């Protein structure tokens, strides 16, 4: 299915690009989320009429993400979790735990933005984690996992 992208989508294209995607991806995700429209003549004309408005909106979203990225870059977030004497955790630290710690530090974050390339953290220590605030604004933070004291 041919669609017009209404915002930049990683791995797919930029605002205004006409791309071909699978029907299910377009119908079930991109179009309902407001990220794309079908590439019909009427929609193309409507998009061209609203292009400046959409570009300004995307620039504002990116600027907000860059401000949050500057606040987050290089920060250390501490997460306390029960651990054994050998340093292994009872359970694990997930992206939801890290997002909650970032929010507790006063910066807006969602668990879907936290990237853990090797899966959940399962041992005490310090880990480098990426927080994708936007496709063009990715902050690198240090997560210090410590043993919880009771």
Swiss-Prot record:
GO terms for molecular function: rRNA binding; structural constituent of ribosome. PROSITE patterns: RIBOSOMAL_L9 (PS00651). The keyword rRNA-binding applies. GO terms for biological process: translation. The keyword Lyase does not apply. Gene3D superfamilies: Ribosomal protein L9, C-terminal domain, Ribosomal protein L9, N-terminal domain. GO terms for cellular component: cytosolic large ribosomal subunit. Binds to the 23S rRNA. HAMAP family: Ribosomal_bL9. Belongs to the bacterial ribosomal protein bL9 family. This is Large ribosomal subunit protein bL9. It comes from Neisseria meningitidis serogroup B (strain ATCC BAA-335 / MC58). The lineage of its organism: Bacteria, Pseudomonadati, Pseudomonadota, Betaproteobacteria, Neisseriales.
